[in-house]
Regions:
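Short coil/turn linking the two alpha-helices of tandem helical-hairpin repeats
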Residues: 70-79, 110, 115-124, 159-165, ...
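Helix-turn-helix repeat elements of alpha-solenoid scaffolds
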Residues: 34-46, 81-91, 125-133, 172-179
Length: 209
């Protein structure tokens, strides 16, 4: 009788999990479809709905943070920039409570801080420069062959070297190494972070010029 009850409970648990996972997958695919078609706002709204419906999933909040970071690279209006990066930080903080010591989230944190430095290097370079380097070092400590951590760390250091007139060769070698890591990297699922190779290839070519 006990075995029968265990089987029934197991069946009920699986039966409840499968539809939820199917809805999550469907929603994520739709969000990426919006994003790939250039409908960034629709994608962000979809990720927000998924994040509310699936509070144990870190990926929707991660992509909300990434979208707002990406929108901020060329933003010149400080008020708009602050709104976007505050939203990015809010959702990244949420993702970090769900998935601790996650190298992908740590890389995204460094990217958000870099947004500020790019906007105003004089104000934010001293404030965030060392922290950005620490974040990339931590991400690589957790996952030494993470291609995004390798690329973004090298890209950050390369641009710093250019700014201070230092030799960029060591960082170009790291960029090349990241390209090779991208070639062999396999994301955990179709929804896990898999970006960066195009940037790595472009920077690698610039290093050769």
């Amino acid at each position: 009788m006990m075995i029968k009850n265990i089987i029934i409970i197991t069946f009920l648990v699986i039966s409840s999990v499968l539809p939820a996972q199917a809805n999550f997958n469907k929603g994520m695919k739709k969000a990426f479809e919006y994003w790939q078609n250039g409908n960034t706002d629709e994608a962000e709204n979809m990720f927000e709905r998924i994040a509310k419906a699936e509070p144990k999933e870190w990926l929707p909040s991660y992509y909300i943070a990434q979208i707002n970071s990406l929108k901020s690279w060329n933003e010149k209006d400080e008020a708009i920039l602050k709104n976007q990066l505050d939203k990015a930080q809010e959702h990244l903080d949420l993702a970090m409570t769900i998935s601790e010591d996650n190298p992908e989230l740590i890389v995204m944190q460094a990217q958000i801080l870099t947004n500020w430095v790019v906007f105003d290097g004089m104000t934010y370079g001293m404030k965030y420069g060392a922290k950005i380097s620490e974040l990339y070092a931590k991400a690589l400590e957790l996952e030494p062959e993470n291609p995004r951590a390798t690329l973004c760390k090298a890209d950050w250091e390369l641009n710093s070297a250019k700014y201070f007139g230092k030799d960029i060769a060591p960082f170009c070698e790291e960029i090349e190494a990241s390209v090779k890591l991208f070639d062999t990297f396999k994301p955990e699922s179709e929804f896990h972070p898999n970006w960066g190779k195009e940037r790595a290839v472009v920077v690698a070519e610039e290093c050769k010029a």
